[in-house]
């Protein structure tokens, strides 16, 4: 097990072992993911484009500031801005069959796709979710496609909570469905997945 860290600026590195790295100030990670060196790391851009990279390819460094830019270790480009980073086992069969990835955009579009549809490590980027013009991806989460609830929260303090099974799984190139109606000046700023009681 190792830790994969990514800064706000997009510097990425991995630790040599499973000791959680200590960071502070400019060296603090925006994303910190625990993974096996055999896992696949997914970098997801705000545009909905994504890249899959074998964890062992990510450069090892003592400090995140010594890492490499995400677009140097993946097929994403320097024009991409990261929205999420997550890890999956290289053998997706190790996950429950119904495991899904849930994406949410700032305009409230929500989509669920089976992780079995995600490609493995490749030199090509792929579309995780179709993001409409002017919109951007804000959240990516994993769920079991069964007993969870989804909470969306907006900048103006509105919220909606609904059952996960209200959203059916769709293919990777789909844009998704409208998760909530928004006021013209409002936008979704957060999405969480909760277990039901």
Region roles according to the model:
Residues 1-197:
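Short, structured "edge-of-domain" segments at secondary-structure transitions
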């Amino acid at each position: 097990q190792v830790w994969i860290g990514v800064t706000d600026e997009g510097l990425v590195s991995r630790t040599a072992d499973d000791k959680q790295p200590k960071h502070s100030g400019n060296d603090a990670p925006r994303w910190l993911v625990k993974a096996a060196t055999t896992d696949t790391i997914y970098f997801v851009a705000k545009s909905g484009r994504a890249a899959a990279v074998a964890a062992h390819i990510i450069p090892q460094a003592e400090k995140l500031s010594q890492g490499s830019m995400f677009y140097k270790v993946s097929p994403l480009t320097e024009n991409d801005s990261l929205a999420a980073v997550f890890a999956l086992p290289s053998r997706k069969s190790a996950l429950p069959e119904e495991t899904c990835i849930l994406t949410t955009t700032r305009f409230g579009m929500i989509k669920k796709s089976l992780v079995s549809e995600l490609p493995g490590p490749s030199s090509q980027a792929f579309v995780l979710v179709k993001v409409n013009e002017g919109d951007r991806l804000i959240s990516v989460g994993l769920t079991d496609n069964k007993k969870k609830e989804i909470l969306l929260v907006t900048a103006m303090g509105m919220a909606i909570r609904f059952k996960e099974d209200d959203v059916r799984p769709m293919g990777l190139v789909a844009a998704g469905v409208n998760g909530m109606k928004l006021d013209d000046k409002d936008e979704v700023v957060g999405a969480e997945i909760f277990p039901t009681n």
